[in-house]
Amino acid sequence: LFMALLHPRSGQVLVDGEDIVNYEPADLADKIGYVFQNPDLQILEDTVFDEVAYGPRAKKLTAETIKKQVAAALAATGLAELADAYPRLLSFGQKRRLGVASALALNPRTLILDEITNGQDAIEKERMMRYLQTLNEDKGITIVLISHDMDVVRRYAKRAIVLKDGCLVYDGTPTELFGGAHDVEEWGLRRPTAAALAGRFGFTAATPEEFCSKLQRKGAEG
C-alpha cells in the first residue's frame, strides 16, 4: 500500500499529507525509500560508491549533485571509508547500512525498512538503530520499520502497529502494547525480554529499567 502497488479498499495512505493515489510513480519514488529484508538483492554495482550512486544516476542528476548526495548518505551510515570497497565482500551489517545509504541518496522523506535488524549481532543492531534514530530526529525522516524483534520495537518505536491475518489488531505506543493488558503471544509475537522475565517473577514490566526496579523491590520484600 505504501508503495502504491495496491490501493486501499477504504481509508487513505498519506505521504507528506497527500493521498498516494494522486502521485505519479516517479514522484512517489522520490518521497519513499525502501530497503529489502535481504540486502544482497539490492547490490547491483562493483563499488560501494557506485552502488549508492545508482539511484541518483538513474534520475540523471548532475555529477556534482550525485557526488554530494552519495557522500552525505555514506557519512550518515558510517560507510564513508568504504566508498571504494566491493559491496559483496562487506559484512552482513555493512550491507544493511549500504541498503539504507542507497535509499538515503535520493533524499526520501520516508524510509520503509523490512526486518532491518535480522541476522545482526547485538552491537550491529544497536549501531543500526542509532543511525535510524539520528535520521529521524536530526533530518525529520519518517522511519517505517517492519520487524518481529520486539526488543527493538519496545526500545526505539514511537508508535507500534500490529497486523494479524491482514487486519489491524493494535495501534498505539510500545509501552501500552507490552504493559500487560494485551496478549501479544496470541498475535504471534514474542514479548520483549524484560516483559517475558517479569512474567516469570509474577509481575509486569515494559522496560529493563522497570524490571530491575520491581525485582529489587520484590527482593527487599522477601
Regions found by a protein language model. Name each.
Residues M3:
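Helix-to-loop junction immediately C-terminal to a conserved catalytic motif
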Residues D165-G166:
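Conserved ABC ATPase "signature" C-loop
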Residues G11-D19, L28:
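Conserved ABC transporter NBD signature motif
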Residues L111-D114:
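Catalytic Walker B motif of ABC-type/P-loop ATPase nucleotide-binding domains
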Residues Y86-L90, Q94:
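Conserved ABC ATPase signature
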Residues E64-L82:
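Conserved ABC ATPase "signature" region
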Residues N107:
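Conserved catalytic motifs of ABC-family nucleotide-binding domains
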